[in-house]
Every structure is written in C-alpha cells, then in structure tokens.
C-alpha cells in the first residue's frame, strides 16, 4: 500500500488506496498507458492534496518485480471467465507491465500468441489491463508485440501476426534465446 509521492514514500489509508485503485482500474490499454505517465492528484483523508507518480523518470527509484506462474481463477475473481496461469509477469511499482509466455522448443510460437489472445479476451482484467508489452519465446524464436485496445463494440480483436516482431539487439540482430 505504498506509492511514490514526489520525493518520498508514504503509506495511504484504506480509503485513499481505494480511490487510487478506482482511478487506475478498468481503462483501455491506451488510457492505462496515459495514466501511468501522468501525475495523479489524490485528496488525502485529511484534506491535503498529493501528486502521485506511478513511475519515476529516474529508473533507479522504481521497484521491479518478476512473478512466475500467477494464476487467475474465476472462483476467486468474478470478472475472469477461465482459470489461467501466466508464465512470467514483469511488474514496475506493483503494476503488471509485461507478460512473457514461454513454450518448449518445437512448439510453434503462434501457440503462445494464441494463448495470449485468449488471456486478453477472458482473463486480463483489473490491473492486468496495464500490460503494455508481450514477449513470446520457444527458445528457437523470440518475438514481441504491444497490447491493444478492444474494438469500439467492446469485443477483442486478436493480435495481428503482422504486428508481432522478432526480438533484436541494437544492431537489429535477432535474439532467439532468452537468458
């Protein structure tokens, strides 16, 4: 229950934290990215106002975490349709920003892309709407793609294969194995 607050970290009351959650949850992917870049003006319980940066431009002040096998279960979360287990999730300051789906060598990379499309449609809810980047790998190929908004009618459009790119280094040399 701590967020960075211009220069220092402060604990928020349950009511203050709830206001922050309401501000960040259930937006489109684009709106979520904008919220992460902007300052949030929070009125504290005592009437004072603070400006919250969700990410610091000084990257050393952010907290980076990696989770393994996070499970979303409809028995525990009402807006999740199917039970899913995500391979690797990268969080910055507690917000999920990147999702990595790993497959065994020999498994087609498109299976990982299709799996993420299912996750996007049925289980990436709440704070998982903040996912901005997906990485898929089978140790033979490694590719990445950005998350995108649902269509105007609220339906999800699958990630287009033409918008999935090979992972490369700064000289545009393909990187296939993740270490």
Enumerate the predicted regions with their spans.
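An alpha-helical interface "stripe"
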Residues: 1-179
